[in-house]
């Protein structure tokens, strides 16, 4: 079973629909419908068959995202595969001690060119690829702890688009893999299902490059952004203080 933490977002059920199309059993809980103790009990209950967690996009910031940050902490402690999407990635960063700050530009429904390291959930995806963005906050990379790395950035303004924990099976992406503006998004979701051991990931692999035709999401398409010269994904590393509430720089 994949647990979807719904941060009251319209994109949540696009994610659910895509995962279910690949045969995954998805249970959706609003971010205020369960607490950390409930997550721990679910993780420890063999009958629940919890194989992975997705923390959905949503409005606001990590501190207003209910159980989202605790979901990240439980996933790290229990080694449960977790994917954070948009606000979900910000919750991942904040839970692990990073600062969440204003993005250089507010982006709503635009496609950006994203370059990545080709590992983890990004394995097998072209670089760069076009990805949908809807956000005004971003993870400050210099505040990530040493065991969390940047995996993807936009080519134009170099905003962090992906992070990965080095010792736990959790990753976050700032872009929306479930959007028709991210044609390669199904492959990322397929990689997550493979990591979690849930569903038939190959069904999503076949949709890669034609997400709109597969019928998983419905936004209009957008023009692509120009490519930029190759740059490293991770320009520097820095340790951060322990996790608590999210530090939001406004």
Feature annotation, model-predicted:
Residues 1, 25, 51, 81-83, ...:
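Structural signature of beta-strand start/N-cap positions in the alpha/beta core
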Residues 1-80, 183, 190-250:
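N-terminal beta1-alpha1 cap of cysteine-dependent amidohydrolase-like domains
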Residues 26-28, 100, 150:
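Generic structural signal for residues in well-ordered beta-strands
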Residues 28-34, 112-115, 131-134, 153-156:
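Short gly/ser/thr-rich secondary-structure transition/capping motifs
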Residues 42, 49-124, 128, 189:
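Cysteine-nucleophile active-site neighborhood
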Residues 86, 135, 176:
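Histidine-centered divalent metal-coordination motifs
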Residues 120-168:
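Catalytic beta-strand/loop cores that center a nucleophilic Ser/Cys/Thr
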Residues 153-199:
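A glycine-centered loop/beta-turn motif at secondary-structure junctions
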């Amino acid at each position: 079973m994949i647990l979807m933490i719904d941060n009251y977002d319209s994109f949540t059920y696009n994610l659910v629909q895509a995962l279910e199309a690949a045969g995954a059993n998805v249970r959706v809980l609003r971010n205020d419908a369960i607490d950390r103790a409930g997550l721990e009990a679910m993780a420890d209950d063999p009958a629940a068959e919890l194989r992975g967690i997705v923390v959905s996009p949503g409005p606001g910031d990590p501190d207003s995202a209910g159980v989202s940050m605790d979901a990240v902490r439980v996933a790290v402690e229990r080694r449960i595969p977790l994917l954070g999407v948009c606000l979900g990635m910000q919750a991942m960063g904040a839970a692990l001690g990073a600062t969440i700050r204003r993005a250089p530009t507010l982006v709503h429904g635009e496609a950006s060119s994203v370059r990545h390291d080709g590992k983890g959930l990004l394995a097998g995806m072209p670089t760069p690829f076009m990805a949908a963005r809807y956000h005004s906050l971003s993870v400050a990379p210099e505040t990530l702890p040493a065991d969390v790395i940047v995996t993807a950035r936009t080519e134009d303004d170099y905003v962090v688009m992906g992070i990965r924990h080095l010792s736990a099976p959790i990753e976050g992406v700032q872009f929306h893999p479930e959007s028709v503006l991210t044609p390669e998004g199904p492959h990322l979701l397929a990689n997550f299902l493979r990591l979690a051991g849930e569903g038939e990931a190959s069904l999503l692999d076949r949709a890669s490059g034609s997400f709109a035709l597969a019928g998983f999401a419905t936004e209009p398409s957008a023009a692509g952004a120009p490519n930029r010269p190759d740059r490293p994904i991770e320009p520097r590393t820095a340790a951060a203080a322990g996790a608590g509430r999210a530090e939001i720089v406004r």
